[in-house]
């Protein structure tokens, strides 16, 4: 992220977050369609819902809660969510070796790194200096399991993809709330 106006930094970060969230949602759907029998999907989704590491972070759970937090807090939460996936996504390309939707899986890590850098640039702008490591936890998710013949591995990956999708949705929401708060525009209704 070269030096640019704050509005451009926010616009770029939101676009990157939206793209990653859509990629995560498409990947989740493709994995589900390919590996999870239709009759099991709903019950598995409910069972997996409680296992997202991000649920242990005291972060806002929706747009209304996000609006109660400062921009710096929202950036820190977004950064934490993004960083928690940097390790696990490096294994995604092995899980989706012959996937059409996930043909770009090798680039997911780079896209996450770009978003991480964009969030750090926003933090520098808003904090007038370098981002403080502060409360950034270094906890992360497990790696994706590349053994797709095992039911346990399939369920683990399904749960991880569900968490990945949820976490990217949260990061996108936080960035959009901040952008709308600072730069009122027609695309703020979401």
From Swiss-Prot:
This is Somatotropin. InterPro entries: 4_helix_cytokine-like_core (IPR009079), Somatotropin (IPR034975), Somatotropin/Prolactin (IPR001400), Somatotropin_CS (IPR018116). Belongs to the somatotropin/prolactin family. The keyword Phosphoprotein applies. CDD domains: somatotropin_like. The lineage of its organism: Eukaryota, Metazoa, Chordata, Craniata, Vertebrata. GO terms for biological process: animal organ development; growth hormone receptor signaling pathway; positive regulation of growth; positive regulation of receptor signaling pathway via JAK-STAT; response to nutrient levels. It is found in: Secreted. Disulfide bonds join 52-163, 180-188. Its main location: secreted. Keywords: Disulfide bond, Hormone, Metal-binding, Phosphoprotein, Secreted, Zinc. One of its GO terms (cellular component) is extracellular space. One of its GO terms (molecular function) is growth hormone receptor binding. Plays an important role in growth control. Its major role in stimulating body growth is to stimulate the liver and other tissues to secrete IGF1. It stimulates both the differentiation and proliferation of myoblasts. It also stimulates amino acid uptake and protein synthesis in muscle and other tissues. The modification Phosphoserine is found at residue 105. The keyword Secreted applies. Zn(2+) binds at residues 19, 172. Pfam families: Hormone_1.
């Amino acid at each position: 992220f070269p030096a640019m106006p704050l509005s451009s930094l926010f616009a770029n970060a939101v676009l990157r977050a939206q793209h990653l969230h859509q990629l995560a949602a498409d990947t989740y759907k493709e994995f589900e369609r390919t590996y999870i029998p239709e009759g099991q999907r709903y019950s598995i989704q409910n069972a997996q819902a409680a296992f997202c590491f991000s649920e242990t972070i005291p972060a806002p759970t929706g747009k209304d809660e996000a609006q109660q937090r400062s921009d710096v807090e929202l950036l820190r939460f977004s950064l934490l969510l993004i960083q928690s996936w940097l390790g696990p996504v490096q294994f995604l390309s092995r899980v989706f070796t012959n996937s059409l939707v996930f043909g770009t899986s090798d680039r997911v890590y780079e896209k996450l790194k770009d978003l991480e850098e964009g969030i750090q640039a926003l933090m520098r702008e808003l904090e007038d200096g370098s981002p403080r490591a502060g409360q950034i936890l270094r906890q992360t998710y497990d790696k994706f399991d590349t053994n797709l013949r095992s039911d346990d591995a399939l369920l683990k990956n399904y749960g991880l993809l569900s968490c990945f999708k949820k976490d990217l949705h949260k990061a996108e929401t936080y960035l959009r709330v901040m952008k709308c708060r600072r730069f009122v525009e027609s695309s703020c209704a979401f």
